[in-house]
Amino acid sequence: MRVGLSWEIRGEAPAGPLWTGVIDAIREADALGFESAWVAETQGSAAACTQPAVFLTYAARVTRSIHLRALGRSVKGEIPVRLAEEVTLLDLFSHGRGGVAYASGRSQSIAPSAVHEVIEFARAAWMTNEIRYRGDHVRFPEHTPDSAPRGPSYIPWEGEYVPQWEWGAARSTADFLALTPKPMSIHVPTYVSIDDDETLEWAARNGVSPYAGVDLTTAEACERLARYRRIADSVGRHGFEVDAVIESNVALDGASDAHTFGGSTHDIACAIREAAAATRASHFVWRHRPGTPGDLGRFANEVQVKLQA
């Protein structure tokens, strides 16, 4: 089982020390062999991290192997092309370690289909050259007509390729465009929060990795991931196509509650394994908060080894 850490940076304290503390923790996690580091998008406070992909692009320069994921990325009010480009740059600067988890439509007070279209567009644009996309919320290029097929479509072969700079005055607008630069891999790790039913079903049917976040109770997360898996199985999708994530708090030698795995390190490892067995989750993410010095090392040495054995 993969094991990662996540952070939600917010508060009215100066951003510099808080951000530096998270970067230092990511560096420590990288040295300890954690699989992933997730930084959530936050808004509305002095220390908020409004652009987690940019934050993690810096983290890419001071780490070697840990995978870097922008978490809870909103699409409301954003330009889909820009969202795809920022993840591409994170992936390039990290030499293939970048990825993104999108927030659900419900958490943004927008239609779930708006999130679905952004994900579908980005995946198509990363994979191939010139495309166009027509949806209810996303159009690329913007002048794509209503007569275009829904979703992504691809430039037809017309017997000869003429570069755009040779078109001349008779034709100045491209109907299909390429997103450049391209990421290291055509399949950039892409996740979506499954805290609304419409997105859960859409993600299961379309092979998008599910993210059961810390705001869900453990019982709710397990129920939703298990339902995701049942739907995916029913349409012939395989578990190895996705990376199913369960995120939770951890209390080393502390009490368990609805949102927290607590107890001894052995108890915590057993509880996480139980949740994974019930859901076929492949990735556990600990929502990390400032705690006892050395807690990352202890978790790595006493819990992570039992999850990866």
Report the location of each language-model feature.
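N-terminal small/glycine-rich loop or linker at the start of catalytic domains
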Residues: M1-A15, A170-I186, V250-H259
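Internal, glycine-rich beta/alpha segment that forms the wall or movable "lid"
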Residues: I79-N206
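C-terminal helical cap(s) of enzyme catalytic domains, especially alpha/beta-barrels
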Residues: A114, V118-R123, A221-I231, T292-A309
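Acidic (Asp/Glu)-rich catalytic clusters
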Residues: R27-A31, L56-S65, V87-G98, W202-R205, ...
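N-terminal beta1-alpha1-beta2 module of alpha/beta enzyme domains
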Residues: M1-T63, V188, R289
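Hydrophobic faces of well-ordered beta-strands that scaffold small-molecule active sites
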Residues: V3-W7, A37-V39, L68-R73, G98-Y102, ...
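Alpha-helix-loop-beta-strand connector modules within alpha/beta enzyme cores
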Residues: T50-A70, F121, N301-A309
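Short, acidic/polar
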Residues: G16-E28, E86, I194-E201, S264-A275
